[in-house]
Amino acid sequence: MTAAAGQLRRGLLMGGIMAASLAVTGTTLTNAAWTDNEYVHAHNVGTDGRCEQDSGTTTTASARQLSGTLLNSNLDSVAALHGLSVTNDGAGTSTASANAIRINPDTFMAPLDASALNTDLLQLSLPLGLPVGSADVYSQWGQTLNNGNTTAASGLITDSGGALGLGQTQNPDNPPVMATLNLGAVIPTALAGITLDVGAASSIAELTYCGDLGNGWQGPLPDPLVERSYQASALNLNADMPTLDAAAAGADTLLRDVNSKLQAAQPGLSAAVAQDLIAASTPLLGGLDSLTPADVETEVKLDLSQLDLTAAKVLLTSTMTDAQGLITVDFGSGVARINLAKAEGGINSLNGKAPNTKIALDQDITNQLSTALTQVLDTWRAKVITAVQQAIRATPASVTATVTVRSLGIPVGEIGLGLGPVTTGQLLDLHYGVPGTPVAPVTTSLKLLVLSPPITALDTLASGLAAALPFISGKALHNGLILGVVETLNTSLQEQTSPVGPALAKALEQVNALLSITVNVQPDQPGYPGTTKSTPLSVTALQISLDPITALDLSIATSSIAYTD
């Protein structure tokens, strides 16, 4: 192998996980990797020839996408999950396990076909068992070259025209889900309604037996070089929460009551307008000898149409995510989805971890999630309230008033006032003093009840009350609807959502006590959760188990290499 080819191979093996793009249905596959003729058939200046010879070393590449135990059953008993094993005898011959598909004399692939594995505990959701060369194949891949160089890869990979691609999906914000683990099926008392979505995961292990000697020449290395990498695209914890269901159901009931509360408020609104009309008449009575507000009677009717609350009701089945993307709440299904990858510190925070790193829901993360949930619930409640306010503002309002003026107890005239229909929002904005709000027109009529009425004074009173009526009506609507109906609704929604936070905190506490998640699992390195093993040299992208029981112990995307001189 040439120096250039060897460097290309190592660089792409280690960088392919981060750079190669492979996605599920609806996206485009990009094979950014190396090709067979580049790492098998290169003959350039810079090699002493020994890298083109049989190594005399037996090497094995093994790749397995799923292994472990489910419901106390070892997955070794499932033939479709046996993975791939390729061995080179060091004398020029590579052989592979029975399920392997040969790509070239030294390279094999075994697409995963686990359709029969779906259980109450584990549901696989990626397209599996597709032909070699198809996009989106979850597969196992191995290569053992005659010179001893060996590679194993497991994950969302494909081989098309000899080009291998594996690793991160094209849309890291919404990666594909490989499998869903129903944790509640194992421990229903503690983890009811809890599921774990595992995103596309890949791993790669490489043995460089023959490579750069450091002097510009390629040859057998004094000590074989082992490199291991992994990629995990997503890890989402889903909590089906009765408190969320109850909050959405309670909000629905509250919204159904809004129109009835609106109708019930109308007599009070009319009374408020009447009271303020009498108060507004005080400075206008100067032309009517010895009259006081007690001599002015009003009869007011304020009519509001039924509210269209469609926009508010849509929010009851909406999905919302906090600003950091830590938690997504589906109010329609009552499920809170926690992005454990981002909770660990960023979009790729499951990756680049030291060997045998545990992913834990510690107190800091729990506090982050609590803050994120509060943000989502507050945003949702604010959106519901805003939608109700907008519905109120859009509804038409009409006001009719009759003002009877008496002198010495004798009615001398009746002033009729008519406003609308105009939108409630226009009247509210007049009350709020919003610049540019057009004044709603008011019609007036005057009925004289005596032979010599004070016409000029009555006209002045009518004009003054007509000018004041839109502002008086806006004030009544604000006090009765915004401060009354809407604020009461807001308080009730707060009461509906208040149990959600403590319920999630309790669920996370249970999960943290029982669920163990480890990334970049390497049995020969410190911190390995099992018995330390020095051979084979392997890497597993994700290991998931439930402690202290053994009903679930799942390893995802394992690649390993072994060699004997």
Description of each model-found segment:
Residues G6-T59:
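Short, polar/proline-rich extracytoplasmic segments that appear immediately after membrane translocation
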Residues C51-D565:
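Extended, solvent-exposed, non-transmembrane regions
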Residues M1-A5:
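N-terminal secretory signal peptides that target proteins for export/translocation
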